[in-house]
Amino acid sequence: MLEQMGIAAKQASYKLAQLSSREKNRVLEKIADELEAQSESILNANAQDVADARANGLSEAMLDRLALTPARLKGIADDVRQVCNLADPVGQVIDGGVLDSGLRLERRRVPLGVIGVIYEARPNVTVDVASLCLKTGNAVILRGGKETCRTNAATVAVIQDALKSCGLPAGAVQAIDNPDRALVSEMLRMDKYIDMLIPRGGAGLHKLCREQSTIPVITGGIGVCHIYVDESAEIAEVLKVIVNAKTQRPSTCNTVETLLVNKNIADSFLPALSKQMAESGVTLHADAAALAQLQTGPAKVVAVKAEEYDDEFLSLDLNVKIVSDLDDAIAHIREHGTQHSDAILTRDMRNAQRFVNEVDSSAVYVNASTRFTDGGQFGLGAEVAVSTQKLHARGPMGLEALTTYKWIGIGDYTIRA
């Protein structure tokens, strides 16, 4: 089965690579329209997936990721339209010039070919990835989690209908709907057909892909994100940022998981934090230094376990640790961070600059929420993933991350001397 999917995807990629921007946008507009027109079938399929997942004991955080609402589905369709409005990088001349030999040389952006994406209970990923791949002239093979099987099938059917109505092969967007995990291992060895693999899931999936894949892998999306509260920070403003970074949508990878508090601001800051977190329904996991103060406040607080500093809670839970200074905060982030998104809240711009320079994450913020690490927020449109590695992409992966380049030499029967 996968062999045939690979062949179909590779053949479709050749056709997609030749499309103009106008032709690709026409397909995307059709997909967005059909997602709204056929929303009832998609939402019904999703409701069945959610019911089964709840019966099987899926966590509330994962259920939130899985669930679609009419508003969320409309947002997904609008994201596709946003991709239409983005500049098409394919065909862009990056640089070039004329050599001494007279050969005119240019480096031009081209599609990667076929993208493989493995993901869990995130039905929006199906459309986000498909739209970005189509915009950049790439075919895609999707393997969603078993929790999303009905939703993905309904969504991909809509996308394939839109492709066919525009005269394009359905093989441009395909999904593996068999939940057999053995197919994941088989997919990881499809280097004959798949040019780049993107796993979007937990650490176990990433480890599996790194160890078994014969295809280049882009990993990321695991977000043990930190906020460091410097001693000069303005407490009222800090609380606004923390509420946003923790509670806006706790199940996302750019949600803050650990708060590092400078010891010189702890006495005045922790009581205010406890009050605010109690109002927000957040459970605090505090180190010994913070626990004594927080236990007298209104927020629910427990003693932090050492391993929780490495946890991506994806829930209304927040680690709180008192640190001696900026050096201590940076050392903690280096040990426990996942190079996703980390922030400093401060009025000391020298400390801010040190934090930016010394924290080696894909996104680093000064006086801002970690929740901004998102393709839409960065103006990239919907994202394929957030890469936390350094090759070949880093941070939110938009259109350019789905391209490579080729060198083109144009001569007049030019030969090398």
Curated annotation (Swiss-Prot):
GO terms for biological process: L-proline biosynthetic process. Keywords: Amino-acid biosynthesis, Cytoplasm, NADP, Oxidoreductase, Proline biosynthesis. One of its GO terms (molecular function) is NADP binding. One of its GO terms (cellular component) is cytoplasm. It is found in: Cytoplasm. It catalyses: L-glutamate 5-semialdehyde + phosphate + NADP(+) = L-glutamyl 5-phosphate + NADPH + H(+). Gene3D superfamilies: Aldehyde Dehydrogenase, Chain A, domain 1 (3.40.605.10), Aldehyde Dehydrogenase, Chain A, domain 2 (3.40.309.10). NCBIfam families: PRK00197.1, proA. Its EC number is 1.2.1.41. Belongs to the gamma-glutamyl phosphate reductase family. InterPro entries: Ald_DH/histidinol_DH, Ald_DH_C, Ald_DH_N, Aldehyde_DH_dom, G-glutamylP_reductase_CS, Glu-5-SA_DH, GPR_dom. This is Gamma-glutamyl phosphate reductase. It comes from the Bacteria. Catalyzes the NADPH-dependent reduction of L-glutamate 5-phosphate into L-glutamate 5-semialdehyde and phosphate. The product spontaneously undergoes cyclization to form 1-pyrroline-5-carboxylate. SUPFAM superfamilies: ALDH-like (SSF53720). It comes from Escherichia coli O6:H1 (strain CFT073 / ATCC 700928 / UPEC). The lineage of its organism: Bacteria, Pseudomonadati, Pseudomonadota, Gammaproteobacteria, Enterobacterales. Pathway: Amino-acid biosynthesis; L-proline biosynthesis; L-glutamate 5-semialdehyde from L-glutamate: step 2/2.
